[in-house]
């Protein structure tokens, strides 16, 4: 029984986001996948309810090295972004990869699996987004709590859009968004156990 418990704990914590070597190798493995995700990124950008020329403020939750942030800052040339992540090593890599966008983004280091993480972020944001990140907390109640903390950060008329694995189940996650206060919650795309879903904050 103890062995099983240890195995489950290892599974929950299989990523070593604080290791420079691990983060570097993990990012290299993600590069081919980012090309595959361009379709979902484009759909996400189209779903943001603002004209692309407006100077909107974007929050990327669990931004990692900034793949989604880079894409959105190109799509919204007058936008700025805050990249939230819990790993300094990931933030370092992001700053390297987004050197050409210097001045249009900042990193804020905080752990979204810990209650109160959102207090370190200065909102509101017209668009809050996330890509293949929140599922890493593993615990359904923690995911639910993350959505509750995101809602107050969204500007009235804005949105939260999440491209992630359907784990916890998509139906549950969409219900948690409604519980948090989001309106118009829906799934915009899904396939291969991943989905793009989210909701809006009424004006």
Question: Predicted segment positions?
Answer:
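A short SAM/SAH-binding and catalytic strip from SAM-dependent methyltransferases
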Residues: 126-141
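Conserved beta-strand signature within the Rossmann-like core of class I S-adenosyl-L-methionine
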Residues: 157-164
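Short alpha-helix
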Residues: 168-180
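Conserved class I S-adenosyl-L-methionine
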Residues: 2-51
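Core SAM-dependent methyltransferase catalytic element
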Residues: 189-203
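A short glycine-rich, Lys/Arg-flanked "PGG" loop and its adjoining helix->strand segment in the class I
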Residues: 144-156
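Class I SAM-dependent methyltransferase SAM/SAH-binding core
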Residues: 59, 65-115
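A short acidic, Gly/Pro-enriched loop at the edge of an enzyme's catalytic core
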Residues: 118-128
């Amino acid at each position: 029984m103890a062995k099983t418990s240890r195995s489950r704990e290892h599974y929950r914590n299989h990523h070593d986001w604080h290791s420079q070597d691990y983060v570097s190798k993990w990012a290299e493995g993600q590069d081919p996948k980012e090309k595959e995700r361009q379709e979902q990124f484009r759909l996400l950008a189209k779903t943001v309810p603002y004209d692309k020329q407006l100077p909107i403020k974007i929050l990327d939750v669990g931004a990692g090295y900034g793949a989604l942030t880079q894409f959105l800052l190109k799509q919204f040339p007058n936008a700025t972004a805050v990249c939230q992540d819990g790993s300094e090593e990931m933030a370092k890599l992001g700053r390297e990869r987004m050197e050409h966008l210097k001045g249009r983004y900042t990193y804020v280091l905080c752990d979204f699996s810990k209650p109160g993480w959102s207090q370190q972020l200065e909102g509101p944001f017209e668009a809050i987004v996330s890509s293949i990140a929140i599922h890493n907390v593993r615990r359904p109640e923690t995911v639910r709590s993350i959505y509750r903390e995101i809602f107050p950060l969204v500007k009235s008329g804005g949105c939260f859009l999440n491209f992630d694995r359907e784990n916890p189940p998509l139906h549950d996650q969409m219900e948690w968004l409604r519980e948090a206060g989001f309106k118009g919650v829906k799934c915009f795309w899904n396939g291969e156990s991943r989905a793009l879903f989210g909701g809006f904050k009424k004006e």
